[in-house]
Amino acid sequence: MSLISAVEDRDIHNIGKTSGGGSRTSSITSSKKSLKHGSKSLRKPKVYQTTGELLSREALYKAKLKYGVYQSPAQSYSIGVSDAHAASDKAANLAHDNQTTVEAYKRMFIDPNATKAASKMGPKVVRNNSITSATSKTSXESQTKRKSKESPGAAASKAYSMTMETTSLSSQTNSRSYSITSASSVLSGASGSFNSTVNPKPKTLNLEKVLVGAEKKAESRIKERWEPEKTNFQYGVKTDEHGNLNQFSFSNEMMNNIMAKVDAPKAQDLQKVKKVSAEKEAKSMKFALGAANAVKDMHPGEDIDKSIALKAQKRETYLSQLTSQQVLTLARANVDRQLDIIEKSDMHRKLFTNMEYNKAAVAVAQSNHQKKTEFHNKINMGGGLFLSPEDITKIASGLISPVLGEVSERAEAQRAMDEEIAERTEAYNKSLNEWETMERSIISNDAKVLTTTANRHQTEKKTSQEKIKASFDALVARMDTKVAERETLLEDTKSKEIEFKKQMQQELKDEKARLDQDLEEWGKKCEQDITEARKEQEELLKPYHDDLANAEAEHKTLVEERDXINAEISRLQDAIVDHKRKISGYGNDLDAQKNRNIREDDKLLELGQTKESLESHLNDDVIILANKAKEQAELSTKEARLKQLEVDSLINERKSELNATXIELKKEKLXLLEAMKDVASARGDDKIDEEKVKKLIGMTSEEYLTQNKSVEKNVEDLPTQLEXIEEGDELKKEEIVGAETKNSGGDGVPVSTAAKEATETSSAVQTKEPEEKISIGNKSSGKEDANDCKSAEHSKEISVSQKAGNNKSLGVSPDSLEHTFSGFSQGSSIEDDQDAISNQEKK
């Protein structure tokens, strides 16, 4: 089979565009159909394959190499290939693996960075022969395994191993053979423009690099403005000679070097050495000075070296005079002196009449000429590389010879592969014929088996149908006899059913009449029982309802009394606060009066005033004491009244709570009796179970009714008793008030006229309540203990009578409230005040 085919250049672009989604047979049929239907519009390309497929790129590549037409990887024939430089190498590998499907030539599973990585690694390993695996007659499984081993990493290692060192290229050109990847790697290293992919991905912009480049560019522009470069205005090839124009300027140093017959390069070297040594010396001096200063700072108490101190002083003066006018004048003087020296020296006479200088100039010109002719007859390859034509031919032969060697090797491998394919096809056809004969025998045997089984099934079907028909006839006859027997039995049962229905209807009528009569009698009896039970229930529940009403009324009265007591308590608290305020005012007046008495005593001793003026002052003191005693008496009575009312309010609250619990208990007992009565009436009993009632309540229902009747009588008589008690209390109060007024009028001993006026004013300010009048009269009337005892007993009687009138049922003894009264202590304090007044009178 020949690899030669006349494929035109316009058909190259359509190679590799067929789809490889299925097997080889599907691709063949689809290509045939597409060729048949598209024969009118498209020109059928010339092919060498019998299946109608297009030529592969590998076949076209080998054909072009054979006829001297080299297809470079740098060309843009990248249909279905991600990297154009790896196309030829991948095609050769696929042809070596004997991949016969169209899908293999898409080259979608190669890493485009393989050759790039190989070219960047650089040439280190050199091979004499290309990597070509020997073809052998193996099965398709070994080929697939070998294909799976081919990976981008292996391709990179191959490409890396194929590279060669450029330094040893001239000596090893004839004895080495290289693969196709060497050419692609060289091309990829030479020009980066060919490495573009079919669909390049957009790269992200690195702003840091952009900013760094902008800064560098700005710095370079500023430097160019400040230090402009001298341009070369001569035509021709641009060289770097214009940059060295200032190298041989006629300075004093240059002229001294010329006169001393020293070469310019050596002079420059000497100058550089001197400069470096001066810098080193200055740096060492700087370090020494820094060390000395550090030692000075570490030990401030020690003496400093005079030289160091002198240098430091000079440095300070120098720093202070950097911007002074003296420094500027010295600099200007130095510049003027240097200009005068330059003007006085005749450089032209020294330059053009000196033979040694001319010889040195000729030597320099010759050396520069040799430097210029260094790259004569050489080609600039770019990047500062100049090569001779001989070197270029050697490099080109070294690059092309391995390619041609590998092409010849691949051609031999292809011929061996064609022979192996022919042998395989022959063996496959032979096995296919054997398989077809086996299939024919299987089909004939299957037909025979089908006919025999069909005949057997027919015979079995006939015998089974006959058996089923006989059994069905016997079953029908047997069922007919059973049906006749059941029909006779059905007629007998129907006649019996009619007679039974008539009998049952008659019995139902009789039973219904009897039940109606019994229901009427039972309804009348139930109505009588209900009326009797209601009457009995009303009689039993009447005392409970009465108790409940009485308890609620009593609770209401107690609540009203509690509200009144609370109002009285608040009023008394306000009065107590007022009295305390007045007492504090009287105390302040007493203190002022005492101070005044002391002053008056002093004046009396000094001036000897009369007794009348002294008595008048003492009478004022007595009036104030009387007012204070009066307010204290009112305060004590109101405090006693307040505490008594608080006790009464607490008692009323407890009693109201007790009444509430009793009401709840009576309600519960009433509900219990009602429930027991309902249970007894539901059971049909005439009376309640008295034993159970006694266990629950503690007495029988009759006893409970009699007890509640006596309580009702007591509750009815309670208002009349309370009225009588209140009338008796009022009479007692009037008698006590009359007796107190007599005692206050007859038994009171007047202290002075001012004391009488105080008692009259105190009696005029008394409140309407009789208790307050009596207490005030007792405390303001005199010095005797009998009056105080009477007032205390009177307050006790009032509290006892009030409790008897308000709460008749309260059992609190009057002796339990004695500790709340503070009249005795106040009376004693009044006596002490009066004794003090009498002592002053005696003085």
Curated annotation (Swiss-Prot):
Which residues are recorded as modified (Phosphothreonine)? 720
Superkingdom = Eukaryota
What GO biological process terms does the UniProt entry carry, in alphabetical order? Answer: eisosome assembly
Task: Say yes or no: keyword Membrane present.
Answer: yes
PTM N-acetylserine: at which residues?
Answer: 2
Query: Which parts form a coiled-coil structure per UniProt?
Result: none
Instruction: Please note every region of biased composition (Low complexity).
Output: 752-764
Stretches of Basic residues bias are at: 33-44
Major localization listed first in the record, in broad terms:
cytoplasm
Q: Identify the InterPro entries for this entry.
A: Eisosome1 (IPR024527)
* UniProt entry keywords in alphabetical sequence: Acetylation, Cell membrane, Membrane, Phosphoprotein
According to the record, the residues making up region (Disordered) are: 13-44, 120-176, 708-843
Q: Kindly list the positions at which Phosphoserine occurs in this protein.
A: 2, 88, 130, 182, 401, 584, 710, 763, 775, 816, 828-829, 838
List locations, semicolon-separated. Answer: Cytoplasmic granule; Cell membrane
Bilayer topology reads: Peripheral membrane protein
Query: Where is the sequence biased in composition, kind Basic and acidic residues?
Result: 781-797
Gene Ontology CC: one annotated term: plasma membrane
Main function? Required for normal formation of eisosomes, large cytoplasmic protein assemblies that localize to specialized domains on plasma membrane and mark the site of endocytosis.
Q: Which family does it belong to?
A: Belongs to the EIS1 family.
Record's protein name: Eisosome protein 1
Organism lineage reads as: Eukaryota, Fungi, Dikarya, Ascomycota, Saccharomycotina
